[in-house]
């Protein structure tokens, strides 16, 4: 979780701030001193509470809407809340069981990512988002080449996670079917189980050492592999539940909502934000302007990386209003990241 420079608050001010924010998150209405006097469990007068709330407003943790006598948290107030005041509520046994069952029924990486994003959305009631692993992180299991015409070849790649990619390539010269078969057999025999990022470098290294007829086979392999095994321009991210934000009271400004949905549609900026968190251990929380994206000024993003095979594969998270139930969403994201990573472990290591 991101560290921040929280103001020094005495225990009474911390308790009132926690109570006010928790109640505002629950009800969505500004909270006044009388309400806090009734529900905070402190033996102090409403006048004393008003003075403390005024102090919290002076240091930027609360604000007073013009139409209400109550107060609401600012983005800075939410930051202090999630960094030092929130009391986590981990997912219940039934939620964990549902999440595990949904992931277990998924076949292949894309299906797993889709299930994870849908379950995050369903359990948080907001937007679930998962960044996809880069293909070059996966070992390739098998490759076939199918001639399409004089210049084009269909490369069929099967990866260790059972995903299949079809790529139409245009090698430097025309190949006979027998040549394509020979190259495919060589690549499958020598490089099955290796990551894409390793294969081309190995081919070039072996080509420098090769002699005679082996040199020709390797040269053909380099030509075809240079096209077929480059990282593909994948979508990069799976999202679910975007329309859930349309009914959120805090996101009623249509112009701002349109900007948000345009960001959802393009995905590029959100994916860049997720990429910024991929090497950060544990949960990261961006509140409003902390994202650095104008289109996300009115929302919060809770993320965590997921890992398998000892390496970070991607990031998942929840996008929702700043007034979200952080006590539930933060541990939900943590749990989902752990379970998605476990589901993506190679067979035999789970």
From Swiss-Prot:
Source domain of life: Bacteria
Recorded hits in Pfam families, A to Z, give:
HrcA (PF01628), HrcA_DNA-bdg (PF03444)
HAMAP family, per database record:
HrcA (MF_00081)
- UniProt key word Ribonucleoprotein: no
Q: What this chain does, per the record?
A: Negative regulator of class I heat shock genes (grpE-dnaK-dnaJ and groELS operons). Prevents heat-shock induction of these operons.
Q: Tell me the keywords, alphabetical order.
A: Repressor, Stress response, Transcription, Transcription regulation
NCBIfam families per the record? hrcA
* Single Gene Ontology BP annotation: negative regulation of DNA-templated transcription
The species this protein belongs to is Xanthomonas campestris pv. campestris (strain ATCC 33913 / DSM 3586 / NCPPB 528 / LMG 568 / P 25)
Q: Identify a single GO molecular function assigned to this protein.
A: DNA binding
PANTHER family tied to this protein? HEAT-INDUCIBLE TRANSCRIPTION REPRESSOR HRCA
UniProt family annotation: Belongs to the HrcA family.
Protein's recorded name: Heat-inducible transcription repressor HrcA
């Amino acid at each position: 979780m991101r560290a921040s420079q929280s103001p020094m608050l005495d225990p009474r001010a911390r308790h009132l701030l926690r109570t006010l924010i928790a109640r505002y998150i629950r009800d969505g209405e500004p909270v006044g001193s009388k309400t806090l006097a009734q529900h905070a469990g402190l033996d102090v007068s409403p006048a004393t509470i008003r003075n403390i709330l005024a102090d919290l407003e002076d240091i930027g943790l609360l604000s007073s809407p013009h139409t209400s006598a109550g107060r609401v948290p600012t983005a800075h107030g939410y930051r202090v809340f999630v960094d030092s005041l929130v009391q986590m509520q981990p997912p219940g046994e039934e939620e964990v069981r549902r999440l595990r069952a949904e992931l277990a029924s998924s076949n292949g990486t894309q299906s797993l990512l889709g299930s994870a994003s849908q379950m995050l959305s369903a359990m948080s009631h907001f937007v679930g988002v998962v960044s996809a692993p880069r293909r070059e992180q996966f070992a390739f299991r098998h490759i076939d080449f199918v001639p399409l015409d004089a210049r084009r070849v269909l490369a069929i790649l099967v990866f260790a996670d059972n995903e299949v990619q079809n790529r139409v390539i245009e090698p430097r010269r025309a190949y006979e079917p027998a040549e394509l078969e020979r190259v495919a057999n060589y690549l499958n025999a020598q490089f099955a189980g290796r990551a894409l990022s390793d294969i081309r470098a190995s081919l070039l290294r072996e080509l420098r050492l090769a002699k005679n007829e082996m040199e020709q086979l390797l040269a053909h392999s380099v030509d075809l592999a240079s096209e077929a095994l480059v990282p593909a321009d994948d979508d990069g991210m799976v999202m679910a539940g975007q329309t859930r934000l349309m009914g959120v009271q805090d996101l009623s400004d249509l112009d701002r909502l349109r900007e948000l949905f345009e960001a959802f549609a393009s995905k590029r900026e959100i994916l860049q934000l997720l990429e910024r968190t991929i090497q950060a251990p544990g949960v990261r929380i961006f509140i409003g302007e902390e994202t650095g994206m104008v289109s996300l000024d009115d929302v919060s993003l809770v993320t965590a990386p997921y890992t398998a095979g000892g390496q970070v594969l991607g990031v998942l998270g929840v996008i929702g209003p700043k007034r979200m139930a952080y006590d539930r969403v933060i541990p939900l994201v943590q749990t989902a990241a752990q379970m998605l990573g476990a589901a993506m472990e190679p067979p035999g290591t789970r």
